[in-house]
């Protein structure tokens, strides 16, 4: 992988990971559109670590409170501070972990197809639009219970299908549960932390077990670029959220689906 390729793929991962437009779809499509070799599991690990560090740093105060209050709640045997929300994040992560363990091989083979990506891109554009237009309410992060977390977690499990978008699916689920835009989005960002860490761990174990060659410079560049672009994307996503809602991403998904259809069918 050359230097320019590492930069471009790092930018794509950083921008798309936390926007409801599907990072996996873009990373799968780039080699198809450009003729580049697949970036491989090592590069995937690097950019996942970059985006993971970005979301932890951006929400460092919230993450610290969730983690510390979660530990305090264990000692106190009751909810303390933000511990209820923290445990909701943990509970919400379980469905995607189970689905990943059971279905990852099938997802990485049978579902990594342009037709699948086009279908999920359109379907979840419509659902995102419906959630933003009709379903969002006034519930906040403090109103999220374990039932809500499981429902959002199931949406995150569905998002393992390429083209769906993890953030898009979880934000949509949050909106349909009556969360306001900011709360649905922030809960989605919080849930990204454990699932991204789990994905990075799986990729690391794969590299170790299969003795995959490591392009340290390319991985470092991709990781740094994905970190910088991800933290920028999070900032502007939240800044523009109330002004524009989800419609820019709905429109982008529909345009992307049309372009892909014209290119491949």
Swiss-Prot record:
It is found in: Cell inner membrane. The chain crosses the membrane at residues 1-21, 39-59, 87-107, 110-130, 144-164, 187-207, 217-237, 244-264. Bacitracin is thought to be involved in the inhibition of peptidoglycan synthesis by sequestering undecaprenyl diphosphate, thereby reducing the pool of lipid carrier available. GO terms for molecular function: undecaprenyl-diphosphatase activity. Its EC number is 3.6.1.27. The gene is uppP. It is a multi-pass membrane protein. It comes from the Bacteria. It holds the Pfam family BacA. GO terms for biological process: cell wall organization; peptidoglycan biosynthetic process; regulation of cell shape; response to antibiotic. The keyword Membrane applies. Catalyzes the dephosphorylation of undecaprenyl diphosphate (UPP). Confers resistance to bacitracin. Keywords: Antibiotic resistance, Cell inner membrane, Cell membrane, Cell shape, Cell wall biogenesis/degradation, Hydrolase, Membrane, Peptidoglycan synthesis, Transmembrane, Transmembrane helix. Belongs to the UppP family. This is Undecaprenyl-diphosphatase.
